[in-house]
Design a protein with these regions (language model features):
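Intrinsically disordered, low-complexity regions
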Residues: 1-182
């Protein structure tokens, strides 16, 4: 007798595996759930499962699988008018590109994600994306651009932690120097 597992059960299985840090099993279960959710009317849930799989694959060190899992999901969210999840999908793609060493593609995806988050006013998540974008810009050798991006990202945080406050203070120094020169 063949036992059929529901998409909901697959999702729960994936969440349990993720909590146990069994990321590869989690990713595979999320992908299986996505396949089950690929019925008409369930595309958004399928895309969400694929993004969860992408995150799990990244945690497992499977960068190419992470990228493949999330590619195209931003379109599903865009067509559904879900800008926040569209931006998150682009951020997931950017993280996969970054892990693969495709820094130009990572920067472009982070930038688009940041713009979408700004449109909807999600400053907290935008701050995280801007900090990731800054790190990529730095790796690309764009030091000044990285500095400006990091400062813009930190300015968005309403209640910065101690580390963020310190970084903000350090970043103000070069800007105040440049202001004195002009």
């Amino acid at each position: 007798m063949v036992e059929t597992i529901s998409p909901s059960e697959l999702r729960q299985e994936a969440e349990r595996a993720y909590k146990k840090k069994d990321y590869l099993s989690a990713a595979k279960a999320y992908q299986a759930a996505a396949e089950c959710y690929s019925q008409p009317g369930e595309q958004i849930t399928a895309a969400e499962m694929l993004n969860n799989a992408s995150v799990a694959y990244l945690q497992a060190g499977e960068s190419e699988a992470a990228l493949q899992a999330t590619l195209g999901t931003e379109i599903t969210f865009s067509e559904a008018g879900d800008t926040r999840r569209q931006a998150i999908a682009l951020g997931n793609q950017a993280a996969a590109y970054e892990a693969l060493g495709q820094l130009e593609s990572a920067a472009k995806a982070y930038q688009t994600s940041s713009e979408l988050l700004q449109e909807i006013g999600d400053q907290e998540l935008r701050s995280v994306v801007m900090q990731s974008l800054s790190a990529v810009q730095l790796r690309l050798g764009n030091k000044m651009e990285a500095l400006f991006t990091m400062q813009a990202g930190l300015e968005q945080i309403e209640n910065p932690g101690l580390k963020q406050k310190l970084v903000k203070k350090i970043l103000r120094s070069p800007f105040s120097y440049f202001n004195r020169l002009t």
